[in-house]
Amino acid sequence: AEARVPTFTHTREIVESNPDTPIDGAEELRRAAGETGAHMHQCHVHSTSRRHIERVLQTLALARAEGSKVTVEAYPYGAGSTGIGAAFLAPEKLDAWQITPSNIMLLPSGEVIADTTRLKEIRETAPGTACIVTYLDEFDPNDKATLIQSLAYEDSIVASDAMPIFWLDGSNETREWPLPAGGSTHPRTAG
């Protein structure tokens, strides 16, 4: 609060996904904002809340009504990227996320995980493999409404995953300038 800058907060699990969590992630953010006076900015509000976004946003709205400065960010799509070894992608935890192994695609190969056996194999042999996890189906009207709700929340901003670029030819991301052929960026950030 003294620095007058927001915290960029990655919340813990919500109670709907993990009833054993010591405190619901959205409630913890609400309390921290109220107790410290800090501007709390919740990262990836829709991917951490998934189909429980309405309840989470109501909790954050309560914080705002209590005088706290709370903002959020969301991706404009129903997927996120991480490493296949992430704790929440353990086969026994997928139900809490309302996903199955087929919601996970490996990068850069494009392989969609066929089943739990394959998921366990990749997690054991190559836990750092990047993947895309689809948790909201943008073609499903209910999931699309959930996504839009998170983007339309007051003081919400559009975010991205900040993952490395995976080129189709297998080459690695570089800081080379100008951008390599096939790369693109927004004109405001082009230099």
Name each region found by the language model:
Residues R30-G34, H39-G191:
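Active-site neighborhoods of metal-dependent hydrolases
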